[in-house]
């Protein structure tokens, strides 16, 4: 009963912190709209880039820092999956320097299998973690200033990622979420990251079958034997007890999965997951229903970390109107995230582009700033291949620069309700934007 009471108090404190942060955001929004009433949106141009540091504005779910207080993170998290494919080590360090040192971003996300896509010639799992590790080695005093998150790969038999956990590496090994794999993968990530602890250790995708990565329905014929969730949670509890990780989170999970992980944690006396990293953007808003309820501060208090908030780059508008940018990820890697270039997605993206023009911002800025308005979004994971993209993306989370009006938000919802989650619509048609 004592543990339950403590849990209730923790949830109450976290909800109060969220509401307090929300009040500040609403107050900022009102001031911005009042001072610039002639515009739907307060915006900045690329010519007026800022170096203002962002505040640590949101609690990371139920997580507590070393001081026992809510663990606060910036509303934007630096994603790193292009480090090692489209970005060199020098590029990676420059992005980390800018985001962390100049803009105050205190949240960095990576994974043992990064970079992606793995179809890229020369791909090597773990490269991204290695780049981050060399940056940490160059900036040792900053290690305690950032929340470092990485991920263990889920079910993937005969994978080079699994083989990379061994010393020396093996050509391949199964990726599973059993106890031995969880402990081994964590140790391998610690070595590559050149640190002795990971702030947030996430399960990249489930060990069991679950519809993911564009799959829109659950197919019971695809069910398979899976590692018991209790075994995975117990292993994560061992890592917490050993001081190797401080918190753990889920990724690409369903409402059923979230509930099962919480139940297993409570039965084992292990802390609950504090975050969930799922696909979420203007073209994919399925999180808003059952998952949002389960993860709410008043329930399991699990913060959403949206990945691909720009739909693989499609919500930058770079693939609209017949454009095929040679350096665009969806052009360079034609098997990667093509669902965002389907005809239904292109139609919705064009509608959002029109709203962005009316608001006086880029489509990318609109898409990211919209994520910031969602009460369940703790920190939105951004990725960039150029410094210009990175600066624009971070600026979208500065409320003094970009605040979407109620009118703009209503227009966004109108498009959504007319073209709900278009990336989930099955289609055999070739991507319209790349024909």
Model-derived features with residue positions:
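Surface-exposed, active-site-proximal loop segments in enzymatic domains
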Residues: 117-123, 157-176, 209-218
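Active-site groove signature of glycoside hydrolases
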Residues: 191-214
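Beta/alpha (TIM)-barrel catalytic core signal, keyed to glycine-rich beta->alpha loops juxtaposed to Asp/Glu
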Residues: 57-62, 116, 206-415, 431-435
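An active-site-proximal structural segment forming one wall of the substrate-binding cleft
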Residues: 178-197
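N-terminal binding-site loop/beta-alpha segment at the start of enzyme catalytic domains
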Residues: 39-151, 180, 196, 241
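N-terminal chloroplast transit peptides
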Residues: 1-24
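Active-site mouth loops of central-metabolism enzymes
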Residues: 80-90, 167-183, 220-226
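Aromatic/hydrophobic pocket-lining residues that form the small-molecule binding cavity
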Residues: 92, 128, 182, 186, ...
């Amino acid at each position: 009963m004592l543990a339950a009471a403590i849990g209730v108090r923790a949830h109450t404190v976290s909800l109060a912190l969220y509401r307090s942060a929300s009040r500040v955001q609403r107050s900022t929004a009102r001031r911005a709209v009042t001072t610039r009433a002639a515009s739907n949106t307060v915006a900045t141009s690329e010519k007026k880039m800022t170096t203002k540091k962002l505040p640590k504005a949101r609690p990371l779910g139920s997580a507590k820092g070393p001081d026992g207080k809510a663990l606060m993170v910036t509303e934007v998290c630096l994603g790193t999956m292009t480090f090692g494919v489209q970005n060199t080590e020098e590029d990676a360090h420059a992005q980390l320097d800018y985001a962390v040192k100049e803009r105050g971003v205190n949240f960095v996300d990576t994974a043992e299998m990064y970079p992606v896509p793995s179809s890229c010639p020369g791909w090597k799992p773990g490269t991204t973690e290695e780049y981050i590790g060399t940056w940490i080695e160059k900036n040792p005093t900053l290690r305690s200033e950032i929340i470092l998150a990485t991920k263990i790969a889920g079910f993937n038999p005969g994978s080079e990622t699994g083989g990379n956990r061994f010393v020396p590496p093996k050509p391949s090994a199964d990726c599973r979420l059993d106890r031995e794999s969880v402990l081994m993968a964590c140790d391998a990530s610690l070595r590559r990251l050149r640190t002795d602890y990971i702030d947030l250790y996430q399960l990249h995708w489930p060990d069991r079958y679950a519809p993911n990565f564009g799959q829109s329905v659950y197919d019971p014929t695809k069910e398979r034997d899976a590692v018991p969730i209790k075994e995975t949670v117990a292993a994560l509890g061992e890592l917490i007890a050993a001081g190797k990780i401080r918190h753990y989170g889920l990724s690409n999970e369903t409402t059923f999965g979230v509930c099962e992980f919480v139940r297993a944690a409570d039965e084992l006396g292990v802390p609950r997951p504090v975050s969930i990293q799922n696909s979420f953007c203007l073209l994919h808003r399925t999180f808003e229903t059952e998952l949002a309820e389960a993860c709410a501060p008043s329930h399991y208090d699990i913060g959403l970390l949206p990945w691909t908030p720009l739909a693989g780059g499609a919500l930058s508008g770079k693939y609209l109107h017949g454009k095929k940018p040679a350096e665009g990820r969806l052009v360079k890697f034609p098997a990667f995230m093509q669902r965002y270039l389907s005809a239904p997605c292109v139609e919705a993206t064009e509608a959002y582009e029109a709203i962005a023009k009316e608001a006086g911002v880029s489509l990318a800025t609109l898409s990211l700033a919209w994520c910031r308005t969602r009460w369940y979004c703790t920190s939105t994971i951004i990725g960039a291949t150029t410094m210009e993209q990175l600066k624009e993306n971070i600026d979208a989370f500065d409320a003094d620069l970009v605040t979407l009006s109620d009118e703009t938000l209503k227009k966004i919802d109108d498009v959504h309700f007319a073209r709900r989650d278009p990336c989930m619509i099955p289609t055999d048609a070739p991507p319209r934007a790349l024909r």
